[in-house]
Amino acid sequence: MEYLKMDESHVEAIAELEKMCFLDPWSANSIASELHNPLSDWFVAVDNGMVCGYVGSQSVLDGADMMNIAVHPDYRKQGIGYALIERLITALKEKNVISLCLEVRVSNESAIGLYSKMGFAVVGKRPGYYRNPREDAYIMRKEFAK
């Protein structure tokens, strides 16, 4: 498994993974626009040329928000999500970012478990944040060691 910075060659595969994993997926154009955003950091997990996972964030000053993460269903429970987030955190620390926030569906116990294992804590709740279906989101945050 390789963990690489996202480039143009990954956009279509990420868009397909979005469609596979989410009811309200990002378009290929939206994903591609992140390549030109200096505040964005996106990484992919590639296995034998296939994009099997990705993570993306945007940072402002010393904080960042994880915009999206997904792992192909055939590759789940293999540590890929964990490794992608670790790679993202390494890149953010290099930019002097000291914290990472994210939103997660309150029903997504698997993701909440992963984030908690990685040191994220619930710091708030956004009522009705998600649609398709409508659901609340937990806001989770991780502070990085300096």
Annotate each PLM feature.
Residues 2-74, 85-87, 91, 95, ...:
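Acetyl-CoA-dependent GNAT
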Residues 66, 100-104:
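Conserved hydrophobic beta-strand within the GNAT/NAT acetyltransferase core sheet
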Residues 72, 76, 103-107, 132:
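Residue-level recognition of the GNAT/N-acetyltransferase active site
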Residues 77-91, 109, 113-117:
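Conserved acetyl-CoA-binding loop-helix of GNAT-fold acetyltransferases
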Residues 103, 116, 121-137:
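Conserved catalytic-core motifs of GNAT/GCN5-like acyltransferases
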Residues 136-146:
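Terminal substrate-recognition subdomain of acyl/acetyltransferases
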